[in-house]
Amino acid sequence: MKKFYNIEGMIRNGFKLSRDYETLDFSFAKFGDAAAESLAKARSIKQLRRLTISGKKLTAITAKAFGASETLGNLESLKLYKNKIGDEGLKYFAESSKLPNLKSLRLSWNNIGPQGIKHVANSTNFQNLTTLVLSENHIGDEGLGYFAEAKSLENLESLDLRNNKLTDQGAIALSKSKNFPKLQLIDLTGNALTAIGFDALAEMKIFNLIRA
């Protein structure tokens, strides 16, 4: 892949715009997988806690680079809306032990399907995750069935599943899970659930169950 040369300059400008050394948002910059690979190796981001890169067609290459990074260990929030991370990219995040402080992972509009969710369910690296946003993907009932079996999401508090081709079948599978003791919010807007699915989820005693 073509080497990206100006990442340190972009980082400096990004920190100036955010007015601190813990937040970067490259959503309004020219930024692709090559830039992400360079960012993941930059020494000047060791204190970074919040990173946003949306709408840049980033692929699994970016996820692989971030997952292997030796300098993103303090990252708490990663927002990658409207990219092309896909199932393969989610696999890299799920298998990474280099992001131990990650609390919020937001992957709306990233072409994620059931296999991507299976990687999440099998992961042991999401113990600190409190917010997971997967809206506008296509995980379906199969994916939600996998998700219900997740063993390392015991601290998850907020789950966004808007517009994911879900039906009562997936909702019932999730409702039977005992793996989310701290879950307080589920957003299921834009799915094909009926009262049957919502009644099942109500048994989980979710504080905020968004239906529409």
In which residue ranges do the predicted regions lie?
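Eukaryotic endosomal/vacuolar membrane-trafficking regulators centered on PX-domain-mediated PI3P pathways
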Residues: 2-5, 17-19, 124, 188, ...
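Leucine-rich repeat
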Residues: 6-15, 32-41, 59-68, 86-95, ...
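N-terminal alpha-helical scaffold/docking segments in eukaryotic complex subunits
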Residues: 17-19, 23-28, 42
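Inter-repeat linker/turn residues at the boundaries of leucine-rich repeats
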Residues: 19, 43-46, 70-73, 97-100, ...
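Conserved hydrophobic beta-strand positions in leucine-rich repeat
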Residues: 22-26, 48-53, 75-80, 102-107, ...
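Consensus "Asn ladder" position of solenoid repeat domains
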Residues: 29, 56, 83, 110, ...
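Eukaryotic tandem repeat interaction scaffolds
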Residues: 88-89, 97, 102-158
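Leucine-rich solenoid repeat scaffolds
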Residues: 175-212
